[in-house]
Swiss-Prot record:
Domain of life: Eukaryota
Cytoplasmic-side segments: 1258-1305
Organism, scientific name: Canis lupus familiaris (Dog)
Annotated gene: CNTNAP5
The name this protein goes by in its record: Contactin-associated protein-like 5
Domain F5/8 type C per the UniProt entry, residue ranges: 30-174
Side Extracellular, residues: 25-1236
Protein localization: Membrane
Length: 1305
């Protein structure tokens, strides 16, 4: 099967090569001088210094020694008539002999008729040729693309500033022969087959055409079964319709298979090549090629009877055609090697011609181009004082706005303005400040197509017709009679116009015009060029230089391209990309990068190749563990039961991950480790082993290969996990399921060989026997680690560098990396071409320089940093170049941007190796570290290359110096070889950045006591990481911080005591906050903060800081109290710290004892005392920490408890597997089963639960009613905004313990 596309590709390549060889200009003998044999009459020019045509051939010295114009300006040109169309391959120039007159740069133009010129382009831009540096040397240029033309025009652009324009020229090439047919738009040419049916598996059709019409059929063929092929012009573009053996779509209703080309109605020659092998098609128009696969079921194209060219005749109706015919010329028309036009010229019997001639008739139409949006205009005279007005012309443009026509009407009729505004034609007649008439017509007229406009006025009625729509013209009437004006200004107004002859309320027109008629008389625009008619400024006459800047579409990743006359724009909406050309991904390349930015677990889009061709993929990033897991869900992660499968009718299930295989492969290849859990539950269903070695169940991986090993086993071993550790149910087999038991068992494990992942399909064949059943589950694809984000290299000599293959980035280039250094300067990377280059360097301690040259001269961007960049900290650089702009960004400094010129060279052509950390000259090398280097989304493996390079070391230590601040709340940044992690041991918080609060709900009797007494025997067996659980029992200062939520007052929140001293934090009866200090036998110090009622069910944050005599209390991030003790004070021999109710209440202060009576009902969060986190120790290290918990302590988020009953606990699934997971020994099913035992059991459990709830509620309501009278007075003291559940909590403090137990059930 693989040989078919390979042969197809070879055949297509061969055909394409032969076509290009036959049509190219690189004929070995096509370099003859063509101008040296011409007579002087073959030369013409815009003007001549002597008034006569001087010999302008190369190396001629007679006469004036060459050509010089009367005036040296940008409007001059030298032209030659070569007599016939020839193949032109090269040109050469000299200056005028014996003078200081020579041209230093020029452009070329070509024409078949001496009219409607075409500029020579290279790289899609008007090409500028380098001229001479003196009068005698010859400057020779071989054309990259040959040209076929009869007329050649040299247009000087720059010349010797100390002299004038002077030229002697030569043109090289050879004769050119072709077969041409002219179609008048009402005829066609038929090629009849020798048999009824022509069936082909391969087709090659080639031709050239030129036309002034935007629509028309070039050729068509069809078969009775629905096959058809049609090539037609549609609005200046070529549409190819192609269907194979598909009777449903017809030409009249089906959209084209592909559309290519633009502005093809310019009366210039265009090349077409169609190559087909089976369903694979290459469609080329000029230099643009599109590959596609055609519709239909068969590989052969079946055409009945004939092919028609120029139109689609209706059978039995001579002169009638199905669609609009082609109007223009076709040249060298070949169908599968048959020269159709040659057959027609020789009147062969296969060819039937209509009114077709065999020479190309050229309409003598002169277009003009308005180049400048501020200074271009054309002035043509009219016939003044004629009763009425008549003006018509055609225009084409990409701009939405521009002046088309302005004229001052005679007899005081006012001023007529015709403009294009928002793509709509607007006609206004204005007299003084009064608008006497206004007409709006058309829409989207800035589509680049030719549109005709006709204005006719008689007396007080004016008519505006668009695109020859005489049936429904737009009309208006005026209050005055209209008389033709004296001067008509097209496109704009002169700068020096001082009167009201020309008005332009908007910018000048940029575009092309032709066929201008005034008072029903055509205007000779060549006379305008010669200066004998009218006037003009900034026009190209006899040339329409419109360009489609959206062909090809340089908007990447599916961005929509729109354009004006001078530039193009990209709409990146809904692409997942941004930037001037939709080059930059909106998303990061991995979950590791999201984690580095401080994100927590959740669904994210990742773009593994950045700005590369692969799109973003949605994944789940689990950023709650030390390893950052990336999970990709597929369409069937539930346990699925299978019955009735056998080798003849196997069960198969394909898995869809919501992305392409290329996206998944890129993610897997970038990860350090990937895995998928696979589970096979079985009852009399064998898994792998069979007598002949063929497995009963297998899975398909990324390369569409069959894999017979199961989870927990390595590739190539037909075993399960139990087979490796010899723990299978039957030692004769290597999987539990292969024991073939009549009871449920399973084989479960992880597949972790990255080259085989992900699992794309599972096949099961052994569930068709009696009592045979299987249930399988394949978990999501899970990966961790980013192999490239921390991929770093250290350069420690200036002469060292890494080299990589050439950076290919013709149209778009983006480079990003991190660096750190202490050096003053150095080159990060460099890549060279013949003329082009790209370089990034640190040019000074505070400057980054990005330099690039695409052939138009170097462009240099420099970003100045207000702080030093050689501070041995990591800094980020992103440099980008595209067809719209060049940019450089350093860290979070403002991005520096410079627009790219729309003309000139635009391809970045590099050919040397890419040097990283230095240059090819081994000078200005970089000293320091470079990390995570990406070029156009490709990740360079710096570490691997550094292993085999001298002067360079893989890796770079010292991440915490830059990223340590990302660890919050006392967390400590710890270095790793690849990155860092946050050690939250000394923090009351946890999580990857020590930002996740550790909090718990307290009931009235809950008590958490942390003991400071030493020694602790358990300390001998704990790890060093837990050392912070224990602390100094005699601190000289207190740093206390915690958050709380409660509705109960009074309450005791925290109590720290020694044998003589204590510190207590409590809420008074009125809800005020009180801090009580008893230190060093001083009197008890009481600090009250009564700014509000803190028992208001809102989260409050408290900080108490004492150092020596100074005490500061901060509540809700505001300093509420400062105090200086009279002498140095300190806690001595601290015994314990208690959260909630103090159980040993002997010796308690009376106020503390009152608050302690009710305990604490609410939530405490992130409790810290110096280096101790008692609440975290109770919840995370209860077995090793000196902490005692009495009563019920439920972990919960205090933030979630605001306005929620603190006694209501909601269970959530672990975020480690967001998709859920079942791991029961007996499989659960997601199918509907009719098992009556199961249904009965469920009903019984439900009934039991209902009766239990009724009994509990009845008893609770009875006891609550008995205590209601007693608590009625208490309830009046509570704040009105307290929730009833909190009031109930407080009320129940005086009830019996049995009642409390029932309430919390």
């Amino acid at each position: 099967m693989d040989s078919v596309p390979r042969l197809t590709g070879v055949f297509t390549l061969l055909l394409s090569g032969l076509w290009h060889l036959g049509s190219s200009a690189t004929n070995y003998n096509c370099d003859d001088p063509l101008a040296s044999l011409l007579s002087p009459m073959a030369f013409s020019s815009s003007s001549d210094l002597t008034g006569t045509h001087s010999p302008a051939q190369l190396n001629r010295r007679v006469g004036t020694g060459g050509w010089s114009p009367a005036d040296s300006n940008a409007q001059q040109w030298l032209q030659m008539d070569l007599g016939n169309r020839v193949e032109i391959t090269a040109v050469a120039t000299q200056g005028r002999y014996g003078s200081s007159d020579w041209v230093t740069s020029y452009s070329l133009m070509f024409s078949d008729t001496g009219r409607n010129w075409k500029q020579y382009k290279q790289e899609d831009s008007i090409w500028t040729f380098a001229g001479n540096m003196n009068a005698d040397s010859v400057m020779h240029h071989k054309l990259l693309h040959s040209v076929r033309a009869r007329f050649v025009r040299f247009v000087p652009l720059e010349w010797n500033p100390s002299g004038k324009i002077g030229m002697r020229v030569e043109v090289y090439g050879c004769s050119y022969k072709s077969d041409v047919a002219d179609f008048d738009g009402r005829s066609s040419l038929l090629y009849r087959f020798n048999q009824k049916l022509m069936s082909t598996l391969k087709d090659v059709i080639s031709l050239k055409f030129k036309s002034m019409q935007g629509d028309g059929v070039l050729f068509h063929g069809e078969g009775q079964r629905g096959d058809h092929i049609t090539l037609e012009l549609q609005k200046g573009r070529l549409a190819l319709h192609l269907n194979l053996d598909d009777s449903k779509p017809r030409l009249s209703s089906s959209p084209p298979s592909v559309t290519l080309g633009s502005l093809l109605d310019d009366q210039q020659w265009h090349s077409v090549l169609i190559e087909r092998v089976g369903k694979q098609v290459n469609f080329s128009v000029d230099k643009h090629t599109q590959h596609f696969r055609t519709k239909g079921e068969a590989d052969a194209l079946d055409i009945d009877y004939e092919l028609s060219f120029g139109g689609i005749p209706v059978p039995g109706k001579p002169g009638t055609f199905l669609k609009k015919n082609f109007h223009g010329c076709i040249e060298n028309l070949y169908y599968n090697g048959v020269n159709i036009i040659d057959l027609a010229k020789r009147r062969k019997h296969q060819i039937y011609t209509g009114n077709v001639t065999f020479s190309c008739s050229e309409p003598q139409i002169v277009p003009i181009t308005f180049v400048n949006s501020s200074s271009s205009y054309l002035l043509l005279p009219g016939t003044p004082q004629i009763d009425g007005l008549s003006v018509s012309f055609q225009f084409r443009t990409w701009n939405k706005d521009g002046l088309l026509l302005s004229t001052e009407l005679s007899e005081g009729s006012g001023t007529l303005l015709l403009s294009l505004e928002g793509g709509t034609v607007r006609l206004v007649i204005q007299k003084m400040t009064e608008r006497t008439a206004e007409i709006l017509t058309g829409s989207s007229l800035n589509d680049g197509l030719w549109h005709s406009v006709s204005i006719n006025a008689r007396r007080d009625r004016i008519t505006l017709s668009l695109d020859n729509d005489a049936a429904s013209p737009a009309q208006d009437t005026t209050r005055v009679q209209i008389y033709s004006g004296n001067s008509y200004y097209f496109g704009g107004c002169p700068d020096n116009l001082t009167d009201s002859q020309c008005l332009n309320p908007i910018k000048a027109f940029q575009g092309c015009m032709r066929l201008i008629f005034i008072d029903n008389q055509p205007k000779d625009l060549i006379s305008v060029q010669q200066g004998s008619l009218g006037n003009f400024s900034d026009l190209h006459i006899d040339l329409c230089s419109i360009k489609d800047r959206c062909l090809p579409n340089y908007c990447e990743h599916g961005g929509f391209c729109s354009q004006s006359w001078t530039t193009f724009y990209c709409n990146c909406s809904n692409t997942g990309y941004t930037g001037a050309t939709c080059h930059n991904s909106l998303y990061e390349q991995s979950c590791e990068v999201y984690r580095h930015q401080g994100n927590t677990a959740g669904f994210f889009y990742i773009d593994s190749d950045g700005s590369g061709p692969l799109g973003p993929l949605q994944v789940y990033c689990n950023i709650t563990e030390d390893k950052i897991w990336t999970s990709v869900q597929h369409n069937n992660t539930e346990l699925t039961h299978v019955r009735g499968a056998n080798p003849e009718k196997p069960y198969t299930m394909a898995l869809d991950y919501g992305g392409s295989m290329e996206q998944l492969e890129a993610m897997i290849d970038s990860s350090e480790h990937c895995e998928q859990e696979v589970a096979y539950h079985c009852r009399r269903s064998r898994l792998l082993n069979t007598p002949d070695g063929t497995p009963f169940t297998w899975w398909i991986g990324r390369s569409n290969e069959k894999h017979p090993y199961w989870g927990g086993a390595p590739p190539g071993v037909q075993q399960c996990e139990c087979g490796l550790d010899e723990s299978c149910l039957d030692v004769r087999h290597f999987c539990n399921c292969d024991a073939d038991k009549d009871e449920w068992t399973n084989d479960t494990g992880f597949l972790s060989f990255k080259d085989h992942l992900p699992v794309t399909q599972i096949v099961i064949t052994d569930t068709n026997r009696s009592n045979s059943e299987a249930a399988w589950r394949i978990g999501p694809l899970r990966c961790y680690g980013d192999r490239h984000f921390w991929n770093a290299v250290s350069f420690y000599t200036e002469a060292s560098y890494l080299h990589f293959p050439t950076f290919h980035a013709e149209f778009s280039a983006d480079i990003s990396f991190f660096f750190k250094t202490t050096a003053l300067s150095g080159v990060f990377l460099e890549n060279l071409g013949i003329k082009d280059f790209i370089r990034l360097e640190i040019s000074s301690p505070s400057e980054i320089t990005f330099a690039i040259d695409v052939g138009n001269g170097p462009v240099e961007l420099i970003v100045h940093s207000p702080s030093l960049l050689n501070d041995n900290q990591w800094h980020y650089i992103r440099a980008e170049r595209n067809l719209k702009e060049t940019s450089l960004q350093v860290d979070s400094l403002p991005r520096m941007t410079r627009e790219t010129s729309e003309e000139g060279h635009f391809r970045l052509q590099l050919n040397s190796q890419l040097f990283v950390g230095g240059t090819s000259s081994r000078q200005k090398g970089f000293l320091g570290c470079i990390r995570s280097l990406h070029l156009n989304g490709q990740k360079l493996d710096l570490e691997e290359r550094a292993k085999v390079t001298s002067g360079v070391r893989p890796g770079c230590p010292g991440h915490c110096s830059t990223y340590g601040s990302i660890c919050h709340n006392g967390g400590k940044c710890v270095e790793k070889y690849s990155g860092y992690f946050c050690d939250c041991t000394n923090s009351p918080y946890e999580g990857p950045f020590c930002k996740k609060e550790v909090s718990a709900v307290f009931e009235a009797g809950t008590s958490v006591t942390y003991m400071f007494q030493e020694p602790y025997p358990v300390t001998k067996n704990i790890s060093l990481s837990s050392s912070a659980i224990y602390a100094d029992a005699a601190p000289s200062k207190e740093n206390i911080a915690f958050s709380f939520v409660t509705a109960q007052a009074p309450s005791l929140l925290l109590y720290i005591n020694s044998s003589q001293d204590y510190l207590a934090v409590l809420l008074c009866k009125n809800g005020s906050l009180q801090v009580r200090y008893q230190l060093s036998k001083e009197e008890t110090q009481v600090f009250n903060i009564d700014a509000e009622n803190f028992a208001n069910r809102r989260m409050h944050h408290l900080k108490i800081n004492r150092e020596g005599r100074e005490l500061a209390i901060q509540v809700d991030h505001q300093l509420r109290l400062s105090y200086n003790f009279s002498s140095e004070v300190e806690f001595r021999a601290i015994r314990s710290l208690t959260l909630g109710k103090v159980r040993e209440h002997l010796g308690l202060d009376s106020e503390i004892a009152k608050a302690n009576t009710l305990g604490f009902v609410g939530c405490l969060s992130s409790v810290q005392y110096n280096q101790v986190a008692p609440l975290k120790a109770a919840l995370r290290h209860a077995t090793i920490a000196p902490v005692t918990v009495q009563g019920t302590l439920m972990e919960s988020s205090c933030g979630s408890m605001v306005d929620v009953d603190v006694n209501t606990v909601t269970t959530v699934h672990s975020s480690s597997d967001p998709f859920g997971k079942t791991d029961e020994r007996e499989p659960l099913t997601n199918a509907v089963r009719s098992d009556s035992a199961v249904i009965g059991g469920v009903i019984a459990v439900v009934i039991f639960i209902i009766f239990s709830i009724i009994g509990i509620m009845t008893r609770f309501l009875y006891q609550h009613k008995q205590s209601h009278r007693t608590n009625q007075m208490k309830e009046k003291e509570y704040p009105e905004n307290l929730d009833s559940s909190f009031r109930n909590d407080i009320d129940l403090q005086n009830t019996v313990s049995e009642c409390k137990r029932e309430y919390f059930i």
